[in-house]
Design a protein with these regions (language model features):
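Extended hydrophobic alpha-helices typical of membrane-associated regions
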Residues: 164-222
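Transmembrane alpha-helical segments that form the membrane-embedded catalytic/substrate-channel core
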Residues: 51-63, 83, 87-88, 106-121, ...
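Multi-pass membrane catalytic core of lipid/isoprenoid biosynthesis enzymes
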Residues: 1-35, 132-167, 207, 212
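Functional transmembrane core segments of multi-pass inner-membrane proteins
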Residues: 76-124, 142-145
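Cytosolic, membrane-interface loops and tails of multi-pass inner-membrane proteins
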Residues: 1-7, 116-141, 186-196
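Small-residue-rich segments of transmembrane alpha-helices in multi-pass membrane proteins
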Residues: 75-89, 136-141, 202-216
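Intramembrane alpha-helical segments
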Residues: 4-96
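Structural signature of hydrophobic alpha-helical transmembrane segments
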Residues: 40-51, 105-107, 171-177
């Protein structure tokens, strides 16, 4: 957005400051409601994780050593949007740790990385021109496509594994509906030649990831 001139660096800075302060205020309130004063250690730990998340979000594109432009963006998206958000939320609300939750957390992380990968595939020409060494730029178009397939298929496999380990009813596989547009996306990516045409696919994968999270949760609750 900044590099294309849609918004100015000052506007971006103001938006980041506002979002950071607002997010931290909400995080502190949520942590206090969840743990109170009785579990001060947990409160401190989650507050530090919140700070780490904010720092990771800022460091993604800000500064000369921004990790988003050194091929590490996918790893951080997987960790913070997948493992930390899913497992962390579960601990926050239940005060328990379930190792098997790392399976659906991995699914969310992989799909989040797929969104980023698709975004970077769309922008790879511009990123090359601005010396932004994303993973797609490093891999090249064909390998980036294969990587995209692996992310989506990996998300499916880990979700199915979790359900198989907790299987009670067919409705637990409700989340498979979300993979219909995701598999259609794989077909589009495989046939893609003009990177700009991937722009419309970005929204589809993002919404499919959201749909997966909703349907997966409903399937496990019911």
């Amino acid at each position: 957005m900044v590099s294309s001139g849609v918004i100015s660096p000052k506007e971006m800075k103001r938006a980041m400051i506002f979002t950071t302060i607002f997010s931290l205020c909400i995080a502190v309130l949520l942590i206090y409601v969840a743990f109170g004063r009785e579990n001060f250690g947990y409160s401190v730990a989650f507050f530090m994780l919140g700070l780490a998340s904010v720092a990771a979000a800022i460091k993604y594109t800000v500064g000369e050593s921004a990790y988003g432009y050194s091929g590490l963006g996918d790893i951080f998206v997987f960790l913070f949007f997948g493992l930390l958000s899913v497992v962390g939320s579960y601990i926050l609300f239940t005060h328990q740790i379930n190792a098997l939750l790392f399976l659906p957390a991995t699914s969310i992380g992989l799909l989040s990385a797929a969104v980023l990968n698709l975004n970077n595939m769309r922008d790879q020409i511009e990123d090359k021109q601005h010396h932004k060494n994303t993973l797609v730029v490093s891999l090249g178009s064909q390998k980036a496509k294969i990587y995209h397939y692996i992310l989506i298929l990996g998300a499916l496999v880990t979700a199915v594994l979790y359900v198989e380990m907790h299987y009670q009813a067919p409705i637990q596989y409700l989340f498979l509906i979300a993979f219909i547009p995701l598999f259609l996306n794989i077909k589009v990516v495989a046939q893609n030649i003009l990177f700009s045409e991937l722009d419309s696919e970005l929204k589809k994968v993002t919404l499919s990831t959201f749909l997966f999270a909703i349907l997966f949760g409903i399937g496990q609750i019911l």
